[in-house]
C-alpha cells in the first residue's frame, strides 16, 4: 500500500495537463453582457486525492480494517447572478475507493462511494484580503462495502440524502511574487435520511419484500459526519496548482449496526477561473470581475 509511486504518477499527470491547457480557457456558461453586468468567472478544480483509511461496518464484521483511500473530485464555484457580491454557489462531485485489510492482514474489505453536493453561501469580505462565508448545501451519496470473507452477506449498501451546514474562509496572499489563495472549508450534515438494513438481514429478504425499517431520519445522534477541506492554490498563470489536505469523519449507529469511516487524503490538482467571451469580442477593460473565492 505504498503511496509514493501513486503520487509520482499523479504529479506527472497534473503537470502534463497544465502544460497542455491554453492561456485562455473558455467555459460553457452563457456569456455575460460586458457593457453593464459584472463578470462572474467560474472557479473550477479537478483534483486527485490519496491517503489513509480506517473502516468499520458491523453488518459485515466487528473488526476495524485499515488501508488506503483514493478519490477524484470536481469542484465548481461561481458568484450568483442575483447578488454576486454576497452570494456564491458551490457544486462538487466525487468518487472514492477504499482498500482496507483486517488486523491479521489476511482479508480485504473494499468500499466505493459516489457523492454530489450543491449549495449557496453568503460571504463577507474583510480587511487584509480575507473572505468569510456561511450557508448550506444539499448532498447525496451512494456506495457499497464489500468483504471477501462473508458468504451470505458480502455487501453492505450505503445511501444518504442530507441537508448540510457549510462555509469557508479564504486568504489571498503571496509567496514572494507568486500569488497564493488559502482556503479552509468544513461541511457538516444537519439532517436528512439514510439507508440501513436490519442487523443480520439478507438483501435477498429485502428483495422478497421485507422492507420495513430501511429508511431512517438522520440527526447527530445516529448520523454524524464532518469533512474538513484545506487547499492552497498556487497561481502559475492561466491555471493554478492546487495542493491540500482533506479529512472525512463519519459515524452511523442504527438497527444495532455501527459504521465508522476515518480518512485523511493529500490533494493535488489543477484549478482556475474561466470566463465566457463572445466570439470576436475581447474583454472590456472596464468590466468588473467578481471572483467566487475572494
Predicted regions and their residues:
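Short glycine/proline- and aromatic-enriched beta-strand/turn motifs that initiate or cap beta-hairpins
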Residues: 26-86, 90, 100, 291-294
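Residues on the lipid-exposed face of transmembrane beta-strands in outer-membrane beta-barrel proteins
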Residues: 70-80, 114-122, 136, 163-171, ...
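Transmembrane beta-strands of outer-membrane beta-barrel pores
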Residues: 50-56, 93-101, 138-146, 186-194, ...
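Residues that define the transmembrane beta-barrel architecture of outer-membrane proteins
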Residues: 64-72, 108-116, 130, 155-165, ...
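Outer-membrane beta-barrel transmembrane domain signature
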Residues: 152-238
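Predominantly the C-terminal beta-signal and adjacent terminal strand-loop region
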Residues: 185, 195-197, 219, 223-294
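Cleavable N-terminal export/targeting peptides
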Residues: 1-40, 276-294
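Outer-envelope beta-barrel architecture signal
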Residues: 38-46, 83-91, 128-136, 176-184, ...
Amino acid at each position: 500500500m505504498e503511496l509514493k509511486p501513486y503520487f509520482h504518477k499523479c504529479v506527472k499527470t497534473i503537470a502534463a495537463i497544465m502544460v497542455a491547457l491554453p492561456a485562455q480557457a473558455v467555459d460553457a456558461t452563457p456569456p455575460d453582457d460586458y457593457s453593464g453586468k459584472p463578470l462572474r468567472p467560474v472557479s473550477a478544480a479537478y483534483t486527485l486525492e490519496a491517503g489513509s483509511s480506517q473502516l468499520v461496518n458491523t453488518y459485515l464484521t466487528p473488526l476495524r480494517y485499515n488501508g488506503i483511500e483514493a478519490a477524484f473530485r470536481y469542484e465548481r464555484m461561481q458568484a450568483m447572478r442575483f447578488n454576486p457580491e454576497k452570494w456564491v454557489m458551490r457544486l462538487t462531485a466525487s468518487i472514492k475507493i477504499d482498500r482496507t485489510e483486517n488486523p491479521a492482514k489476511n482479508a480485504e474489505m473494499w468500499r466505493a462511494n459516489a457523492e454530489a453536493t450543491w449549495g449557496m453561501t453568503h460571504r463577507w469580505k474583510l480587511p487584509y484580503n480575507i473572505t468569510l462565508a456561511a450557508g448550506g448545501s444539499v448532498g447525496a451519496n451512494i456506495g457499497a462495502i464489500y468483504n471477501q470473507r462473508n458468504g451470505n452477506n458480502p455487501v453492505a449498501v450505503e445511501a444518504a440524502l442530507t441537508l448540510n451546514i457549510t462555509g469557508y474562509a479564504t486568504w489571498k496572499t503571496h509567496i514572494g511574487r507568486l500569488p497564493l489563495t488559502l482556503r479552509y472549508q468544513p461541511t457538516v450534515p444537519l439532517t436528512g435520511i439514510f439507508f440501513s438494513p436490519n442487523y443480520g438481514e439478507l438483501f435477498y429478504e429485502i428483495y422478497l419484500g421485507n422492507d420495513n425499517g430501511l429508511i431512517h431520519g438522520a440527526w447527530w445522534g445516529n448520523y454524524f459526519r464532518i469533512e474538513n477541506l484545506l487547499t492552497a492554490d498556487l497561481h502559475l498563470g492561466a491555471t493554478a496548482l492546487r495542493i491540500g489536505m482533506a479529512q472525512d469523519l463519519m459515524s452511523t449507529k442504527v438497527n444495532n449496526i455501527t459504521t465508522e469511516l476515518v480518512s485523511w487524503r493529500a490533494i493535488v490538482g489543477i484549478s482556475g477561473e474561466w470566463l465566457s467571451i463572445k466570439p470576436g469580442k475581447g474583454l472590456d477593460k472596464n468590466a468588473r470581475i467578481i471572483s467566487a473565492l475572494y
